[in-house]
C-alpha cells in the first residue's frame, strides 16, 4: 500500500510486498511499499525513508513531499553532510553560507554540521530527494556549500 500511488490494502496476504531489504547490501522498495514516516521537525510534509543505518546503509535518504507552509528548520546535523535535490516544485533553502530558492533540478550540498532549513515556496507541492551521511574528511580538502541547478549544467558525454 502506498500514499504516493493511491494503492491501498495488501495484494493477497497481510503484509505482502515485493520490496526487498538485504541488510548491509541493498534495499529495493516498490511503489506499493512506500509509506509515510513520522519524523520530528517536518511540518506539513510527507516523508518516506528510502534507506537508513537501521537497514544497514551508511547514510539516510528520503523522499519528501512538502505541502504549502511546510518544511524543516534543520535538516542535517552535527558531523553530517547533507544534500537536497528538487524533483518538482519550489522550495527555499538556507544554511550558514547560502540562501536560495530552488526549482525543479535545483540542489544544495551542505558540509558537515551546517544544517539546511527547508521551506515550501510557490504553489503546489514540492517533491524532494534528501540525503545525509556522516562526513569523512579527505586530507588537504575541505567541503563547502554548493547551490546549483542540473538544468544549467552543459551536457557532456559520460563514457567518453
What is the meaning of each model-derived region?
Residues 83, 96-113:
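Short acidic-glycine-tyrosine-enriched beta hairpin
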Residues 1-45, 61:
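Transition-metal
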Residues 34-73, 154-160:
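A short glycine-rich, His/Asp/Glu-containing loop-to-beta-strand
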Residues 3-7, 121-160:
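Double-stranded beta-helix
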Residues 72-78, 119-120:
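Short histidine-centered beta-strand/loop micro-motifs
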Residues 65-67, 76-93:
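Short, conserved beta-strand element in jelly-roll/cupin
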Residues 68, 92-96, 100, 118-120:
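Long compositionally biased, domain-poor regions of proteins
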